[in-house]
Amino acid sequence: MRKVKQNGSVTEQDYQPVLNVALKLLEIPEGYELNSVFGRKQNESDVWVFRYEKLNGENNGLNGEHYSFTVDNESHEILGVTWMDQRFASGQQLPSEKLTKELAQTFLNRTQPGLFDRLENHWIRPHDELITANGKKVIVTGMKYKCYLPEEDTWAWVIVGPEEKIITFEQRIKWEGGRLTEKWLHDIWLDMGNKIN
């Protein structure tokens, strides 16, 4: 196992309780291991950003393949998760709108009970992200179930990819003419100078 990158004076004791809660709700993909842990602010709250990368070192690093998630330090709620892997490259069969909704509901009921019933669905349609794998740009595509949460005036979404896998979930996203909430799970945003480390 490689050494986990951490920021500043962060120790495993600081983040392990939060990680333990998250690991009861999330399934780390086979072949991935914890690569880095950073404490950050998201919507002015303290969060942990966990990044898993491939154990074999293939396509690791910024803009590569990764499984990452953010967890609120106080409530231990999962605020977001993303799985960027070339296995979800565009051109594959995506779930129908009906199945996307069902899979989103199942995921949310497991990770954030009660949230699904409070959401107003605005649309369901394909969504693309860009990664680099084997030195080439790869478009990762899934069906995005985008919702609004009126009581918090925030947005949430679940993106379901090929093989009916959840490839992204985000909640408590503030939006006012554009996204205001930090994008700790988005390598393109990090690559623009919003560094994680």
Task: Report the location of each language-model feature.
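Long, terminal "pre-/pro-" and other extracytoplasmic accessory regions
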Residues: 1-197
